[in-house]
A protein has these predicted regions:
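Extracellular receptor-binding modules and their adjoining Ser/Thr/Gly/Asp/Asn-rich linkers
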Residues: 1-20, 24-28, 32-34, 41-43, ...
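Conserved core beta-strand positions within WD40 beta-propeller blades
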Residues: 36, 88, 140, 198-200, ...
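Beta-strand initiation motifs
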Residues: 5-15, 58-66, 108-116, 161-172, ...
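Extracellular carbohydrate recognition
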Residues: 268
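Short loop/turn motifs that cap or connect beta-strands within the blades
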Residues: 12-21, 66-73, 116-124, 171-181, ...
Length: 475
């Protein structure tokens, strides 16, 4: 089935206040089973408890449910991710000086959480600047966090249980500084889908030696994360800015984009970017490329930690950032794409907030179902606000019809490779989680679900949890 690219112009829309009170920390993820955006946060207006809110994205807007407490305990430095295999939200925050993990399942706009949070590491301290990412294809997640005054740590957690018994168990936490480098901060992490079973971990070091920005590949095995490869110094800046860097993965190019900010004395916070490549557990980077923004000083870019997301429909990245020049601070959004080993910045920047976006509390969550990005920020009034950004670029549109739909691939087929297609009268045996006896339809994006609304096309009936009889198969 062919796809024709259609040009779409990016746009931003009015911000909506989600929560009053001073916003302390926020993170978000997308629940692909329920097609919902989930934010977890800590806010002075809700006693600094761990709260969540669920949003439904429509065309150019988002409708939020009721903010609800996940835990009535003071919580700081939150982060979260979605685990597709388990269909669960995983949230972490510092409670009573420990990194605590909560596991929950979404239904409608309500999350049922396990009642007993788990310590990742039984060490008291000021845990902050944390990150959680999914280990795709497994029931696991990967965590990294900064512990003030000592080493940062990383670990692998396994998700299990149902209802109030949802929980996590954790492998041995590894010190990120075990290779002799100083304590890492502002961790940003993405899964390395091209290599598989490893994450790319970016961070900054702000100490007397080894200052600057770093990236490393961390291999995953069982419940272990390996930090043995030597990290690569991306920038040796003597004054790396706070609330940066950001890293996200492009599965089309099998590379990652890394954006970081350097505090240049007398000038301001200047943004830079590099493309990160991996071969096994060895990483390399392309040439450093200046960030391109707007205003009197186009390289001004700050508050961009956690605010870089990959947009699958356009194969580019969305970046939310704060720009500062002689006219003052404003919240802006733009896009960047990978060309070879070079970042290519868009010349289209949009203002979505007429004041500061503060303290790194700015998150971008991409919604693949509406092909829009959700921005959650700490605005100039210090409150939690959100907006929706329609990502500019070429959006593929399908020409699929009942007559040109041939069948289902019998397995994964790489680009330019050949493979077997199960056509009419045959059986496809590589599905998962099917409901026996239900009709299944191919959607416009190539996914297979029970949704029958046009332009979806009937492909066949599930005869087992893993098999579909394609149209008139009678075997």
């Amino acid at each position: 089935v062919a796809e024709t690219p259609v040009a779409v112009t990016g746009a931003t829309f009015d911000l909506e206040q989600i929560q009053t009170g001073v916003q302390n920390s926020v993170d978000g993820c997308y629940d692909t089973a329920n097609n919902k955006v989930v934010l977890v946060y800590s806010n002075a207006g809700t006693s600094e408890y761990l709260y969540y809110v669920v949003g439904t994205v429509t065309s150019e807007s988002i409708v939020w449910g009721t903010p609800t407490a996940a835990s009535s305990v003071i919580t700081e430095a939150v982060c979260c991710c979605y685990n597709t295999t388990e269909g669960k939200i995983v949230a972490m925050g510092k409670q009573s000086s420990r990194p605590k993990v909560f596991v929950g399942t979404l239904s409608g706009t309500t999350i049922t959480w396990g009642t007993t949070p788990v310590d990742i590491l039984a060490t008291n301290g000021i845990w902050s600047e944390s990150k959680l990412v999914e280990w795709p294809g497994t029931s696991k997640v990967v965590w990294a966090s900064y512990l003030s005054g000592t080493s940062s740590h990383a670990a692998v957690g396994t998700i299990s249980g149902t209802g109030t018994g949802q929980t996590s168990s954790w492998g041995t936490a590894q010190a990120i500084v075990s290779d002799g480098y100083n304590s890492s901060r502002f961790h940003s992490m993405c899964y390395d889908a091209g290599e598989g079973d490893q994450v790319l971990l970016a961070y900054k070091i702000q100490a007397s030696t080894n200052m600057g920005f770093w990236v490393r590949a961390c291999t995953l095995s069982g419940t272990d994360i390996s930090l043995s490869p030597t990290p690569l110094q991306v920038s040796s800046a003597s004054t790396p800015a706070g609330y940066t860097p950001a890293i996200a993965y492009d599965p089309v190019n099998s590379k990652a984009m890394m954006v970081y900010t350097v505090d240049i004395s007398g000038v301001g916070n200047y943004g830079y970017s590099r493309v990160v490549s991996s071969s096994g557990s060895t990483v390399s980077v392309g040439a450093e490329t200046n960030f391109v923004g707007s205003g009197t000083s186009t390289q001004q870019c700050k508050q961009n930690w956690r605010s870089l997301a990959y947009a699958t429909h356009t194969s580019n990245f969305v970046l939310c950032y704060e720009n500062y020049d002689t006219s003052g601070s404003v919240g802006m959004v733009t896009t960047v794409e990978i060309s070879g080993t070079t970042p290519v910045w868009s010349d289209d920047q949009a203002t979505f907030n007429g004041g500061e976006i503060r303290d790194g509390n700015n998150v971008v969550i991409y919604d693949p179902d509406t092909t829009q990005a959700v921005l959650a920020i700490k605005g100039s009034a210090n409150t939690l606000q959100s907006g929706v950004y329609r990502v500019a670029g070429d959006v593929p549109t399908s020409n699929m019809t009942a007559t040109n739909l041939l069948g289902i691939a019998a397995g994964a087929i790489s680009n330019t490779a050949t493979g077997t297609i199960n056509t009419w009268g045959s059986r496809n045996e590589v599905q998962t989680g099917l409901t026996i006896g239900s009709d299944y339809y191919v959607q416009e994006d190539g996914t297979i679900t029970t949704a029958s609304a046009s332009p979806a096309q009937l492909i066949g009936e599930a005869i087992t949890a893993t098999q579909i009889n394609i149209k008139d198969y009678t075997g």
